[in-house]
């Protein structure tokens, strides 16, 4: 009967999925997380600042595919077990998120379209302050393409600086934006926060300049 189905179907789903999650999906996630951690550390140790720059440049596409969630086991291991700091993913993510907002800001300042200007300012604040980049990406940067190119160029440059200065985060960032910058404070590396701020500023300036040059309002309106 339909009434029994509506009651039993969710119950049976839970009964089946809980053991499956603990016995199959959990170990698989742990296994993949371990190998992902190994790969990220290899990338950093082998390529150094180039690895951080590459991560920062492609981070928008990692976010769009939802793959950033796959890095949680790696981040938890780095920040809670060993070595208690993380030098590549979070620096790249924060720089990338801020630069998505800066690209949208450049469009807002350059365009004469009132609606686009309003959207640019609001999505820029959302990305820079809250670390939520989807509005900026989908409403502006991906839509007009050149702002995304500008953000990727700026993020690569900012990531390069962060890698060269060996910046690292010391706690898990809830919002990957300017709000997370205090998490770069370190007693062992007194200049770590300053170096991250420099990296963010360099990336932001490069993003703004690249977007300003590449984005053509006339071409975008065609």
Residue ranges of each PLM-predicted region?
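Helix-loop-helix junctions within the multi-pass membrane cores of secondary transporters/permeases
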Residues: 76-155
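Alpha-helical transmembrane segments in multi-pass membrane proteins
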Residues: 9, 13, 17, 21, ...
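Membrane-interfacial segments
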Residues: 1, 24, 28, 32, ...
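Transmembrane alpha-helical segments and their short flanking loops
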Residues: 49, 77, 135-222
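Transmembrane alpha-helix interface/packing and boundary motifs in multi-pass membrane proteins
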Residues: 56-69, 79-88, 127-130, 162-163
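Short aromatic-rich membrane-water interface segments that cap or initiate transmembrane helices
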Residues: 39-50, 84-87, 184-191
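Pore- and pathway-forming membrane helices of multi-pass small-molecule/ion transporters and channels
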Residues: 67, 71-75, 96-103, 125-130, ...
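Core mid-bundle transmembrane helix pairs that form the ion/substrate translocation pathway
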Residues: 1-63
